[in-house]
Amino acid sequence: MQKNNLNFDKQHIWHPYASMIQPTPCILVKSAKGIILKLHNGKKLIDGMSSWWSTIHGYNHPRLNNALKNQINKMSHVMFGGITHYPAISLCKKLIEITPNSLTRIFLSDSGSVSIEIAIKMILQYWQSLGKNKVIFLTIKKSYHGDTFAAMSVCDPKNSFHQFYHNFLPINIFADNPKCSFDGLWNKKDIISFKKLIQKHKDVVAAVILEPIVQSVGGMKFYHPNYLKQVRFLCDLYKIPLILDEIATGFGRTGKFFAFEHSNIVPDVLCIGKAITGGTITLSATLTTDKIANVISNSASGCLMHGPTFMGNPLACAAAYENILILQENKWKIQVKNIETCLRTYLFPLKTHYEVYDVRVLGAIGVVECYHYINISMMQNYFVKNNVWIRPFRKLIYLVPAYIIDNASLKKLINVISNALNYENFFMK
């Protein structure tokens, strides 16, 4: 039965970034609890990925489950056009409470990429409403903002997953990505490329969009907080809105509730997702200011031209509200600090390994960057055989575990990574 189902999956189901001819092997998960994935064959894996940054409290958290159960008995979904409900109202009150005071208007949607689409449409409508032809977005190389169309246009056109669509995407502007590391020395030369481009194109740039502090899929790099401060200063100088993509970093992952807090700045538009529901169900939000919302609302259209079918889904809103209540108990601060300490203690020594180019740690993120591209199938199989779930990509082996992970489990993940580095055939040389 298990083999038949896996064969069906292999032949018919298209997984993320996977070939249908030679797909990376999938494992069959039966259930998940805490930091453990239980497979149908009885094997248990320690999860080091928190399902792509999302399940920050672990799987099957009783409070999140209860929030979903209580809501599903009332209504699982209702359209959001002309209708509202308490789960959405309660969640949005919380979002306004935990974000900067200037972010007062919230557009709910169903995935991180869509929240970026909405942010881009929001800004385009803003300038159109003011009668200005500003349609270009400025960002930095090695950026990643999602896989939908407008989101792809602000991802690095040469070093992202989206170079195949280059001829079809809107053409935006990319400054050099910052080189000064998060905890390194600041060099004001780091901002020169960005400064030149924003000065040159200030009359056509609609907005700047960045991942604050952490460039995720673009290489898992952590850049200096002063870079973001300088970007904010230049945006203010030229009256250009700043969009910050906190989809991966929001809700405590970097040691701050939002990564932009490391730089003590505030965006004009904020995109959040992934961990917003504790990884239970998909949801995202795009937050903006009174100024931007009022300009759009007073325009000829009178509204933001977007409306997803599952916008404001009550189940997702209920889970997100409970997730924020859990976070507001502030255990996450101690948990993330403990993870960071453990990663620095046990992951940093891998810097001396001959296969390792660099090791980076920030909050509950640990990254081993190798010299060579990784054979993902072989290394992934090795991880599963050794009872851990880690999903490498390109030259990177990284950990973004649930905040509840214990030191012993985290050490186990690191130890398996350390051993995997010794297998020459895991690397494409």
Curated annotation (Swiss-Prot):
<keyword id="KW-0093">Biotin biosynthesis</keyword>
<dbReference type="InterPro" id="IPR015422">
    <property type="entry name" value="PyrdxlP-dep_Trfase_small"/>
</dbReference>
<dbReference type="InterPro" id="IPR015421">
    <property type="entry name" value="PyrdxlP-dep_Trfase_major"/>
</dbReference>
<comment type="subunit">
    <text>Homodimer.</text>
</comment>
<dbReference type="InterPro" id="IPR049704">
    <property type="entry name" value="Aminotrans_3_PPA_site"/>
</dbReference>
<protein>
    <recommendedName>
        <fullName>Adenosylmethionine-8-amino-7-oxononanoate aminotransferase</fullName>
        <ecNumber>2.6.1.62</ecNumber>
    </recommendedName>
</protein>
<comment type="pathway">
    <text>Cofactor biosynthesis; biotin biosynthesis; 7,8-diaminononanoate from 8-amino-7-oxononanoate (SAM route): step 1/1.</text>
</comment>
<keyword id="KW-0808">Transferase</keyword>
<dbReference type="Pfam" id="PF00202">
    <property type="entry name" value="Aminotran_3"/>
</dbReference>
<comment type="function">
    <text>Catalyzes the transfer of the alpha-amino group from S-adenosyl-L-methionine (SAM) to 7-keto-8-aminopelargonic acid (KAPA) to form 7,8-diaminopelargonic acid (DAPA). It is the only aminotransferase known to utilize SAM as an amino donor.</text>
</comment>
<keyword id="KW-0949">S-adenosyl-L-methionine</keyword>
<feature type="binding site">
    <location>
        <position position="391"/>
    </location>
    <ligand>
        <name>substrate</name>
    </ligand>
</feature>
<feature type="site" description="Participates in the substrate recognition with KAPA and in a stacking interaction with the adenine ring of SAM">
    <location>
        <position position="17"/>
    </location>
</feature>
<feature type="binding site">
    <location>
        <begin position="308"/>
        <end position="309"/>
    </location>
    <ligand>
        <name>pyridoxal 5'-phosphate</name>
    </ligand>
</feature>
<keyword id="KW-0032">Aminotransferase</keyword>
<dbReference type="InterPro" id="IPR015424">
    <property type="entry name" value="PyrdxlP-dep_Trfase"/>
</dbReference>
<feature type="binding site">
    <location>
        <begin position="112"/>
        <end position="113"/>
    </location>
    <ligand>
        <name>pyridoxal 5'-phosphate</name>
    </ligand>
</feature>
<dbReference type="InterPro" id="IPR005814">
    <property type="entry name" value="Aminotrans_3"/>
</dbReference>
<feature type="binding site">
    <location>
        <position position="144"/>
    </location>
    <ligand>
        <name>substrate</name>
    </ligand>
</feature>
<feature type="binding site">
    <location>
        <position position="274"/>
    </location>
    <ligand>
        <name>substrate</name>
    </ligand>
</feature>
<feature type="binding site">
    <location>
        <position position="245"/>
    </location>
    <ligand>
        <name>pyridoxal 5'-phosphate</name>
    </ligand>
</feature>
<dbReference type="GO" id="GO:0004015">
    <property type="term" value="F:adenosylmethionine-8-amino-7-oxononanoate transaminase activity"/>
</dbReference>
<dbReference type="GO" id="GO:0005737">
    <property type="term" value="C:cytoplasm"/>
</dbReference>
<keyword id="KW-0963">Cytoplasm</keyword>
<dbReference type="GO" id="GO:0009102">
    <property type="term" value="P:biotin biosynthetic process"/>
</dbReference>
<feature type="binding site">
    <location>
        <position position="52"/>
    </location>
    <ligand>
        <name>substrate</name>
    </ligand>
</feature>
<feature type="binding site">
    <location>
        <position position="307"/>
    </location>
    <ligand>
        <name>substrate</name>
    </ligand>
</feature>
<feature type="modified residue" description="N6-(pyridoxal phosphate)lysine">
    <location>
        <position position="274"/>
    </location>
</feature>
<dbReference type="GO" id="GO:0030170">
    <property type="term" value="F:pyridoxal phosphate binding"/>
</dbReference>
<dbReference type="InterPro" id="IPR005815">
    <property type="entry name" value="BioA"/>
</dbReference>
<comment type="similarity">
    <text>Belongs to the class-III pyridoxal-phosphate-dependent aminotransferase family. BioA subfamily.</text>
</comment>
<keyword id="KW-0663">Pyridoxal phosphate</keyword>
